[in-house]
Amino acid sequence: MMQKNLTFPLMMLYLVPWGIQCIIGNFMPVYVASLPFATEKTVGEVVALGAVITMISQVVWTKFADKSKNKNNVLVLSLILLAAFSGLFLIEGITKPILFIFVILFYSCYMTHQPLIETIAYENYSATKHSFAWFRSFASFGYAFIGLLITVLPKDNPKNFFIYSGILAILAVGITKMVPSKNIETIKTVTEKKGIYNKAYILFLVLTFMFYFCSSITATFFPVYYTAKEGIGGSVGIYSLMVSVSTFLEWGIMIVFSKTLEKMKAKHKFFIMGISGIFRSGIIFLVENQYLILLSFLFQGIWYGLLWSSVTPYIKKIVPENCLASAQGAWTVVSAGLATFAGTYAGGIIADVIGLKMLFMIISVVLIFATGLSIVLVKKE
């Protein structure tokens, strides 16, 4: 009975919130760019500010969950706040200072679900017949599915994206209530640093910074460039469809080629990943046809498929077993925090000076340099 009762809620607990990540990650830049006062620099500032607030809020919320008797209630609170703060962006006539205030409030609870859901699912999955990894895969599926769903939903007004995120947040509240709470302390902060910051790990963080610096710029400014009239002038619906196709490709790479990827050396995987990034940004820079430029999503799928199948196994090889959580956390701060902040902020400034199109040429050059360095920065196996 428990198997039948929990399988569907745990699946949906991943699928729905990661759908929110699809919406905000891809279309927050489109919304900001639609505001009358916004420039490319404004888009970069908003995404960079969101990255900083996300880093801070994750620490605060997980510590709060540690001290709470019921992690499910903490997740519910964060989702209710997320739904409420989504409504702020529906207000007419907001100014730039007000936008930044709304962004701070929104990102203070955005992405909070990720560590909390990982913990709640881990506490409950053993009551089903499925593995933890099986449930975790529905995060990628949810991201892709919602991206596909957006193609048939009204999207002419960028404010609609926040209506959708609010609806999904409320839906996630109901799903959370279907999952039993367990008072098990599974979110732990590993404070032991000895052995983490060895040469191999430091060099990997340097490579991570360079790769994410470039990928964050592409993720932030390509949707703006593709949908803007002064850019490619493409459809938001087509862009959303290709986000889904790319994510399904990413998922497929991890499933179909899992055994092959396990046998490949890390430096080869990161080198191929870098090459795919070069093709991705190079196509965006060189191609102006609104359909041919979508070939860049093929290389985006390869990029992320290799990334998510390579990072954790490689970290396990270069840091002590008792430091894995701390090492993974530091990697996340560099990738999702520092590199994303630096990339989006710098990208906005550069785009204001030389234009969006030339921005992707610069990314290609940086990626050529980073890809070459990957041969040196990734430890021999």
Language-model features and meaning:
Residues 15, 85, 95-114, 209, ...:
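Hydrophobic core of transmembrane alpha-helices in multi-pass small-molecule transporters
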Residues 45-63, 241-256:
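Central cavity-lining transmembrane alpha-helices of secondary-active solute carriers
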Residues 73-87, 268-283, 364:
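Structural signature of the two symmetry-related core transmembrane helices
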